[in-house]
């Protein structure tokens, strides 16, 4: 028999955290294209600096759509390039930074495909003897956004509430 979801003691169970997902997600290709268009119109300008600021919305939120194939990296690439061209240089720095992040994502997929041990072993052998700390209580606090580190906890709570974590 397998575990029940209730036995995992996930938080929060009340209120219904899935309500947040329903408010923030529009699954499918149409939702992905709409999200990309909104990002290119409203979020790309300022991306290079704002992507690392959780108090700003300069993130695309496209990761799940890319993961599930609801939009392709090629589509994102060309739509971003077109937005940059229309802006006549105004978005060049931000667009280039965003495209570099898309390329990093694709590079990671390339590594996962072509380096069979990548998910299970360190990429660099000198890290094989890294002294990992096994602490199930600390792991549970991290998973629930209860570490006591505000930026870490905010990120995990955002993930719980919206299904997305800021950059």
What are these regions (language model features)?
Residues 28, 72, 135-136, 149:
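Poly-acidic low-complexity segments
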Residues 1-122, 126:
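Glycine/tryptophan-enriched, flexible segments
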Residues 57, 61, 134-137, 159:
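Residue-level signal for pocket-adjacent positions within structured domains
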């Amino acid at each position: 028999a397998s575990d029940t979801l209730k036995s995992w003691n996930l938080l929060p169970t009340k209120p219904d955290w899935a309500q947040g997902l329903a408010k923030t997600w529009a699954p499918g290709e149409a939702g992905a294209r709409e999200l990309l268009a909104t990002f290119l119109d409203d979020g790309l300008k300022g991306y290079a600096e704002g992507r690392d600021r959780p108090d700003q919305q300069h993130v695309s939120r496209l990761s799940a759509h890319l993961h599930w194939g609801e939009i392709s990296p090629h589509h994102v690439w060309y739509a971003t390039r077109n937005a940059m061209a229309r802006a006549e240089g105004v978005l060049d720095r931000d667009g280039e930074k965003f495209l570099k992040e898309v390329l990093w994502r694709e590079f990671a997929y390339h590594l996962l495909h072509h380096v069979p041990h990548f998910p299970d072993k360190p990429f660099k052998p000198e890290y094989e003897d890294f002294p990992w700390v096994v602490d199930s209580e600390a792991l549970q606090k991290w998973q629930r956004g209860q570490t006591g580190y505000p930026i870490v906890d905010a990120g995990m709570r955002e993930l719980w509430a919206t299904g997305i974590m800021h950059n």
